[in-house]
UniProtKB/Swiss-Prot annotation:
Organismal lineage: Bacteria, Bacillati, Bacillota, Bacilli, Bacillales
Keyword S-adenosyl-L-methionine: no
GO biological process annotation, one example: translation
Record-given protein name: Large ribosomal subunit protein bL19
Family: Belongs to the bacterial ribosomal protein bL19 family.
Species annotation: Listeria monocytogenes serovar 1/2a (strain ATCC BAA-679 / EGD-e)
Keywords: Ribonucleoprotein, Ribosomal protein
Length: 114
């Protein structure tokens, strides 16, 4: 039974997911359906967490919009993501960056890997 589940989930994995980690700044091109129309919505921010494995793996992106923090969680292998771009590589020493929720302005910046 497990082999069958593994084969099915392996066929559903998205092969062109870039290598990204918490602390990286990414731009997610998400497909949004409004009525009968489908359009692409950009969401750019810092990856604050990545959890799970395989088909159920998700990541959360945080951005500041109109001085309000907005977090959005995406499944890594969903067909609703048209494209995922890594803008900057961040240097962090944690896997979960929840502490960024309490920081404002320059304190919330993440050092870039050269």
């Amino acid at each position: 039974m497990n082999k069958l589940i593994d084969e099915i989930t392996k066929s559903q994995l998205n092969p062109d997911v870039p290598n990204f980690r918490p602390g990286d700044t990414v731009r997610v091109h998400a497909k949004v359906v409004e009525g009968t129309r489908e359009r692409i919505q950009l969401f750019e921010g810092v990856v604050i967490k990545r959890r799970g494995a395989g088909i159920s793996e998700t990541f959360t992106v945080r951005k500041i919009s109109n001085s309000v923090g907005v977090e959005r969680t995406f499944p890594v292998h969903t067909p609703r993501i048209a494209k995922l771009e890594v803008i900057r590589r961040g240097k962090v020493r944690r896997a979960k960056l929840y502490y960024l929720r309490n920081l404002r302005g320059k304190a919330a910046r993440i050092k870039e890997i050269r």
